[in-house]
């Protein structure tokens, strides 16, 4: 850092200081459920939404939920029972939430699993020992060792997103204080996000067309110029 700071400071001083008008995003968001067909025999099934649209706020318990989904609900239902190569989920401070499967032989079945996630959380019940494991896994993700480049990326991201130390401290406290009841309280957030039903699939033409009622639009992933 001692070597970086003076060099970067000089770079900043040389940047143009003229005021630039703020740009406006002039577009209307649209929810177009799209199926992208390809020669693949497996699917990549994604569904997302935003829980802040329903008036809910971000909490550190959502980081614990990601671990729970990764090792329990999504892993067991999408990966173990469903046969997908993998699955993932996540939530952001701006309210965005997603669930994704990859190299998945299923389509509708996986979408149903996403839809039922809130029901799973309403009845979530694990032992104190398992809850501690989920929290430890979450802290492990938060405290992953980083090289200088990774630290710089994290700090720059925090700066751009206006995430201060107090916000991170609050999030960590919410992770450490998480329990079964806190996870159950996330059910409305997940239901809100999944009910927005931003849905996209890349996969087999046969499978996507078989479930065509799930989509507003179906088109080739790669358009061949003829």
Regions from the PLM with identified roles:
Residues 3-9, 112-117, 214-216:
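Short amphipathic alpha-helices in soluble, non-transmembrane regions
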Residues 1, 5-8, 33, 156, ...:
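Generic intrinsically disordered, low-complexity segments enriched for polar/acidic and small residues
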Residues 2-77, 223-226:
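His/Glu-based metal-binding/catalytic segments typifying zinc-dependent metallopeptidases
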Residues 10, 16-17, 26, 33, ...:
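Context-gated lysine
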